């Protein structure tokens, strides 16, 4: 899962991009495997290429822009080739260029068969990325809309029911 709060929950800001990317992999290996410099270099180069991360992946993540931090966070979980990817507010706090790059990463994941669940308060983001939209209101599921049913009006009518009980 890629959390909404990348700085507080998703990344170790003092560590480099490459180390952050390999942390879940190292944790899954237990004591059997340590991260080597060769692995760091390979992970950094692959992340720069696959996720268009700008700057050196040797720098602490804290020194990267918000968009590049978010791409590092995506790379961190995608390196494990998940079957399901949950993204909570995937583009919060990033610039328009980084948003477009992140959307492309999400679309490529879906095209490879990864089930992608996007939690977002940005309606345009939801409409642009989704095949189906589950609309909630008051902590309860209201309806699941198919791609053909999804419009901003339909979503808002379900999310903010006015005068209906």
PLM features per residue range, with description:
Residues 1-165:
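Glycine-rich phosphate-binding loops of nucleotide-dependent enzymes
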């Amino acid at each position: 899962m890629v959390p909404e709060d990348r700085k507080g929950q998703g990344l170790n800001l003092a560590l480099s991009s490459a180390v952050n990317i390999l942390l879940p992999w190292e944790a899954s290996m237990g004591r059997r495997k340590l991260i080597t410099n060769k692995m760091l270099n390979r992970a950094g180069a692959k992340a720069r290429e696959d996720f268009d991360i700008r700057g050196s992946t040797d720098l602490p993540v804290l020194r990267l822009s918000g968009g590049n931090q978010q791409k590092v966070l995506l790379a961190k979980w995608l390196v494990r080739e998940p079957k399901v990817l949950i993204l909570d507010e995937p583009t919060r706090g990033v610039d328009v260029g980084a948003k477009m790059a992140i959307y492309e990463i999400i679309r490529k994941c879906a095209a490879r068969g990864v089930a992608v669940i996007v939690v977002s308060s940005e309606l345009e983001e939801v409409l642009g990325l989704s095949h189906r939209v589950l609309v909630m209101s008051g902590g309860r599921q209201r309806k699941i809309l198919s791609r053909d049913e999804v419009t901003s009006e339909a979503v808002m009518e379900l999310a903010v029911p006015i005068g209906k009980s």
